[in-house]
Amino acid sequence: MKLAVYPGSFDPVTNGHIDILEKSSKIFDEIIVAVIHNVTKKALFSLDERVKLIEESTRHLNNVRVDAFSGLLANYLADKQACAIIRGLRTVTDFEYEMHMAMMNKKLIPNIDTMFFMSDSQYTFISSSAVKEAALLGGDVGSLVPAVVKAGLEEKMLNDG
């Protein structure tokens, strides 16, 4: 079985992330969306909230499941016996950063490859940071994120903003 891991903070998950999952789910038998718990980053959504939002946003993808982890990605990949890391690319800037990360991961875990998937052109400008900023300033992010995420952002803005 070909198992791949799509790691990220996903704060929040965007339509760009879902696009990458839809593409990669056609290639791998199973994909784990590995939500990173990074104590050095201040997240808008809690780890549990991010996991739930991704689960709800990927219900249509039968071979995708969601998990949370902290620590070194290499250790997580070895534990899950993954064969690949999934990464999405929007622009050349993404490629440069992701290539460095792929090389580092290859050094740490030589038997695992990084697979790059190009974002659909309609998603190249979407980032979680931009979505959060737009939502915080009252922008309509409905075309940028799954409906459940839009609702979650609106709730956050009402309760926290």
Swiss-Prot record:
Pfam families xrefs: CTP_transf_like
GO function term, MF aspect, one: pantetheine-phosphate adenylyltransferase activity
Protein's UniProt keywords contain Transferase: yes
Positions contributing to ATP binding: 9-10, 17, 88-90, 98, 123-129
Superkingdom to which the source organism belongs: Bacteria
Keywords: ATP-binding, Coenzyme A biosynthesis, Cytoplasm, Magnesium, Nucleotide-binding, Nucleotidyltransferase, Transferase
Chief place of localization: cytoplasm
Cofactor: Mg(2+)
Pathway where it operates: Cofactor biosynthesis; coenzyme A biosynthesis; CoA from (R)-pantothenate: step 4/5
Location of the protein in the cell: Cytoplasm
Keyword Ubl conjugation: no
BP GO terms, sorted: coenzyme A biosynthetic process
Role: Reversibly transfers an adenylyl group from ATP to 4'-phosphopantetheine, yielding dephospho-CoA (dPCoA) and pyrophosphate.
Annotated protein name in UniProt: Phosphopantetheine adenylyltransferase
Gene: coaD
